[in-house]
Regions:
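Transmembrane alpha-helices and adjacent helix-loop boundaries
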Residues: 1-162
Length: 162
């Protein structure tokens, strides 16, 4: 193999401006990290909430949370990205649709962060649900026997151990 890499290509200017290819790559890395961190935050908050709701004894809380997980885990992430970017704006009311379709500077960023965050929230919800259900039932019974409400039992006993 006698191929020699031309690493100086990264220091050359792009044809459309004064930037170099290396500056483009560093900028792309920054946007990638920003999307990843935003999606991580969305996924962690929503996933923890939905995972907790999936273990709630009231069906009006657990059924929508289960539907959320089933919806977002069973649609591939690439399909969700396309749906959020191209289909959802068409389904919104006219004024809101017009606002979403206008040329915003960070429309792609918001769409990607939301789609990845919502997709990953379903996986985190499953992990939280599994963690809660792995605890012995005696833990929640003991909390309720001590006079805790169901919310207090989750907050002070179940979730810290899950």
């Amino acid at each position: 193999m006698t191929y020699h890499w031309n690493w100086h290509l990264f220091l050359e200017q792009v044809q459309s401006g004064d930037e170099t290819y290396l500056q483009w790559m560093v900028s792309g890395l920054g946007w990638t990290l920003a999307v990843a961190l935003s999606a991580w935050f969305i996924a962690l908050v929503l996933g923890s909430l939905i995972g907790t709701l999936r273990t709630a004894p009231k069906r009006w809380l657990s059924v929508p949370a289960t539907a959320w997980v089933e919806l977002f885990r069973n649609i591939p992430v690439l399909v969700q990205l396309f749906l959020r970017f191209f289909v959802v704006p068409e389904l919104l009311p006219p004024k809101l649709s017009l606002w979403v379709k206008q040329d915003m500077p960070s429309k792609e960023f918001i769409t990607a962060a939301l789609a990845l965050g919502l997709f990953t929230s379903a996986r985190i919800a499953e992990q939280v649900r599994a963690g809660i259900q792995s605890l012995p039932r005696g833990q929640s019974y003991a909390a309720l026997a001590l006079g805790f409400t169901r919310t207090q039992a989750y907050r002070y006993v179940i979730l810290p151990m899950a």
